Amino acid sequence: MIQRRKRRGDSGKSGVENPILMEEEDDDKDEDRNEDDSDDDAMTTIKTMRGKGDGLVSSMLRERDLDKFGRGSEYAYVNESDKDYSSVIVAKDNAYGEKYDVKFTDVNGKKTHFQMGDVLGEILPEEERRATRTHGSCALVGNSGTLLKSSFGEEIDGHEAVMRVNFAPVKNFKRDVGVKTTYDFSNRENARRLVEKGWENSRPDSVALFFEGSSPTNRKRIFEPLVKKYGKSLKVQFLHPGFVNRAHDLWNALKEIIEKEKNKQFHDKPMSGWYAVNFMMQRCESLDLYGFEPYTSKAKATAPYHYFDQVQGVVSVHSFDFAVFAYQKFAKVFPLRIRTKSGWIGAAED
């Protein structure tokens, strides 16, 4: 059974209860309340319990190969005994041959592959560092307008590693969002803007991390032109497609369970922030989420969609409220917390 690791420096559980939370900037928002469920099917799915007798393994695990989500005494997606499931990013040690062939298992369980090609293959990191955590404390900063007037900047920059989403600006917002950036996690649309319009919010020391590299169209029309345009001045990495598929599988598994708990239907498509959270959980000893608050009709009256512009939010593609329910379940088996102006949610217990 997977046991939660304690966050260094935690003294106890936060007294803040069930605030209205949300996710980052990418698409839409929804609202619902969460209850502190302790022993439920979702926790069994996350922990990937493997009992020697009956009763410990949930029907979810019998129906799906969710044991790939667990390893050792940590919450992780990698399984060191199975090489096809052990990669988080694409690297030269898991992309083979002259054309950098990437092997993975698709969403239907079929073994498949694609070639990164010379342009992208040459910029891949040498080693994947599979199954290791490379950072201590980490912050993942979403783009919610609720970050305005939060004064979280210094707190965010105090983490060992910081990820930002879709190249969000930090200039003029230092007090609220900080400036430190270790990773820039981006979807293909923002990668395309980078190619077409340039990089306004250049952060030369950060790693640009993309999760849609398995598509040949994306590689030819977006990522290859991106690498050719910026060369070595832009550090680029790609999530391994097998890891992306496993993160999507986990979304679907938890969605089925949480829909039953909440008696509510959620959208099928994960937002980019879902993959960002799952990546950081593989690379960090602990993770704090900032700007992850649901954009709803109620929230619209109190804060803009983004902290850096006046774009109008939409509510028809993703279920950000579901993502928060899932993150709160993650927090029961991994040192993950969600920051709000009123306090912390999901703080690790003693």
Task: Write out the residue ranges for each language-model feature.
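Metal-ion/cofactor- or nucleotide/acyl-coenzyme-handling active-site neighborhoods
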Residues: 18-19, 41-42, 46-350
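Long, low-complexity intrinsically disordered regions of secretory-pathway proteins
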Residues: 1-45
